[in-house]
Each structure stands twice: as C-alpha cells, then as structure tokens.
Amino acid sequence: MKLTFFGTGAGSFRGSRRQMPSAFVEGILLDCGAGATGRLHDAALFDRVEGILITHLHTDHVSGLFDFLLHTVIQGRKRPLTIVSPPGLSPILRAANDARAMARDPSELYELRLVEGSEPEATIGPWRVQAVPLDHTVYNLGYLLATDDAKIFYTGDTRQPSASDGLRADFVIHESTYADRNADQAHEYGHSTASQAAQAAIEMHARRLFLTHIGDLEGTEAEVLHEVRAAFPDSTVAEDCGEYDL
C-alpha cells in the first residue's frame, strides 16, 4: 500500500514547492487543494479516485475540488464518486453548478454521493471511514480510515490535542504548520507544532508519523524535522509528490 502526497504546504505557503494540501491512498483522496487534479493525472491516479474526504472548508483544502469535478465531466466518468465533508459543502457545490463552473452538473453523468454531517461515516472500497471532530478555527473533521489490515488517521488542520480518547492508528498523517518556538501562534490560528504531532502519534500508538501542512516561516522545515524525530523517531516530513510505502 502506498501513500502519495500531492500538496504538503500550509495555506500561507508562498511559492510552488509545497502546494495546497492533498494526499492519496488506495482510492481515497485526502483533501483536494489547488493543483491536486494535475498531480493526480501526472501520477496516473486520477481514474483511481473513488472517494474524497474533505476535512474543512478553508479554501486551501477544498479549492481543487471544482477542478477535479470538471475533469470528471470532461472525461465522462461513469463510476460513482463519494465525497465526505463537514456541513456546508452542499451549498457551495450547488452554487458552483448554478454558475456552470464544472460545465455541467457531474451528477448528470454519474452517481455523486455527498456524505455531509458533523460526524459522517462511509464505506469506500475497502475502507471504513469514520470522521472525528478536531479543534480548529472552523469545524474540522479528522478521518480514521480502517481496513482489516491497517488504520490511517488524517487530521486536516487542528490545534493540540488531536488524539481522541481511545483512538488508535497504525499511520498518522498530522499537520505541523509551526515549529515549537511558535507554539503560541500555532494555538492562536488553530494549528499544531511538530512536538504536538509527535505526542498525538504516541497517544495513538502509531507505527509511523507523516507531517504535512508545513509552514514557510524561516527555519521551520529544519526545526520541524529535528523536533518531531526527537520525540517520535519514525517520522517523515512529507514532500510534494512524495510516495511512501505503508
């Protein structure tokens, strides 16, 4: 099983080295920031997306969804597509359809299943998907993806603590917008530091931790790597287009 990151930057990240958040694992797209569709095509994974999990409605996590849906129309998709999201996505999609932003309503071509709610659950391919509300400046859902063989937890954006009582995951994909020296700023803006992400992975008994949603303050990336590995050695600061074996 492979985990591929298409965007690993925070919404404030300047430049193209780290694009807006998105990652792919076995048919599931985790968030859909700007640029995700092109990178899915580059990796020959666009046609393998069966479900999209949107953590929250800040534009860096959802702005690429309209490009994705447009491409499903252009390519004549016939297979169902499931989108899981917190409340609020359906009126955005309706407005986009009213404006003909995707050329035509995708649901005219295929079954578009929108599973929207405060704690939605879904089954997508082999995955059992459970949403877990996490603390951010807007309503944010973390997602636990489970099969009989593995559990993956993806946080979206959150301030510490991220781990819900009793939650367990083999692999944790955790945001780390700030280094520890900016912990107060992280809390103010609803984000996490590297050490906080490491603590969440420890609490979830994770085997491996991936950090994403990296900020671009001077020195942040090097500090984040040092700080997370000091607390949780089997950690990786994900890179755009990075592919990792699970």
What are these regions (language model features)?
Residues 1-153, 159-161, 223-246:
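Binuclear metal-dependent hydrolase catalytic cores
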Residues 160-245:
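Cap/insert and terminal regions of metallo-dependent hydrolase folds
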